[in-house]
């Protein structure tokens, strides 16, 4: 009984993996046919680099307060 359940589980996982692979391949081929696959990849690289640069710029402008805490003076 356990073997039958394992076989059903294994076959369903194989079917899901095959469907996922075919969906990603078809989407990739659609994007490549339109010529936007490489452009989209470059935009994603630029966006990720831009967000990294922006976050580091914000971190460098942050002011670290030094001196007495006004909340403790109450």
Swiss-Prot record:
The keyword Electron transport does not apply. One of its GO terms (biological process) is regulation of root meristem growth. The modification Hydroxyproline is found at residues 65, 68. Residues 1-24 form the signal peptide. Transmembrane segments: none annotated. Glycans are attached at residues 34, 54, 68. Keywords: Developmental protein, Differentiation, Glycoprotein, Hydroxylation, Secreted, Signal. GO terms for molecular function: receptor serine/threonine kinase binding. The keyword Secreted applies. GO terms for cellular component: apoplast. Belongs to the CLV3/ESR signal peptide family. This is CLAVATA3/ESR (CLE)-related protein 19. It comes from Arabidopsis thaliana. The lineage of its organism: Eukaryota, Viridiplantae, Streptophyta, Embryophyta, Tracheophyta.
């Amino acid at each position: 009984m356990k073997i039958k359940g394992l076989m059903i589980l294994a076959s369903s996982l194989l079917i899901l993996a095959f469907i996922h692979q075919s969906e990603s391949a078809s989407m990739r081929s659609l994007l490549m046919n339109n010529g936007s696959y490489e452009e989209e990849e470059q935009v994603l690289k630029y966006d990720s680099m831009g967000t990294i640069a922006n976050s580091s710029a914000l971190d460098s402008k942050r002011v670290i307060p030094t001196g007495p805490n006004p909340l403790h003076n109450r």
